[in-house]
Amino acid sequence: MIDYSGLRTIFGEKLPESHIFFATVAAHKYVPSYAFLRRELGLSSAHTNRKVWKKFVEAYGKAIPPAPPAPPLTLSKDLTASMSVEEGAALTLSVTATGGTGPYTYAWTKDGSPIPDASGATYTKPTAAAEDAGSYKVTVTDSKQVSKDSTTCAVTVNPTVPGG
């Protein structure tokens, strides 16, 4: 009997070319030969190896339904449209990506220019200064190169009041 589940753990949803398949499964003893496939699929020796392989690929595709597609990439936690921070306080912006296919990459920008070394789900400037005011955004990209832009957040840095 063909162990389709075992084969699926090795190859996923798509089988490689037949010569790669047989070389790989030889070590796992799932399907040892074309003769074995002919018997399992009810084909005679009159069927060519190419025909046997075609029938096996069809049977493989039907044996275990494909995995459902990943939900779309979204930001379950997005940036707010605006925020204020006191000068000297920490400026922290954060998003949470869900769906898509991880891992994710993050590209933060301020006023349309990339922020060097800002590559995580959270961007923190430990001590905000007046020049940190501006429009911040992050683009999240999953491993299949699907991207999602955050809301643009207008950051205001309030000056500290002397002696206050």
Curated annotation (Swiss-Prot):
Q: Where does it live in the cell? A: Virion
Question: Subunit details for this protein?
Answer: Interacts with the major capsid protein; each hexon binds a single copy of the decoration protein.
Described by its record, this protein's role is as follows: Decoration protein that binds asymmetrically to the center of each capsid protein hexamer after capsid expansion. Stabilizes the capsid and protects from DNA release.
Q: Let me see what the UniProt entry remarks about domains.
A: The N-terminus binds to the capsid proteins with high affinity and high cooperativity while the C-terminus displays an IG-like fold.
Q: Where is this region: Binding to the capsid hexamer?
A: 1-72
**Record-linked PROSITE patterns:** IG_LIKE
Q: Which GO terms describe its cellular component?
A: viral capsid, decoration
Q: Which UniProt keywords apply?
A: Capsid decoration protein, Capsid protein, Late protein, Virion
Q: Which residues form a coiled coil?
A: none
Q: What is the protein's name according to its record?
A: Decoration protein
InterPro entries, alphabetized? DECO_N, Ig-like_dom, Ig-like_dom_sf, Ig-like_fold
Q: Name one Pfam family in it.
A: Phage_pb10_N
What species does this protein belong to?
A: Escherichia phage T5
Q: Where is the Ig-like domain?
A: 71-164
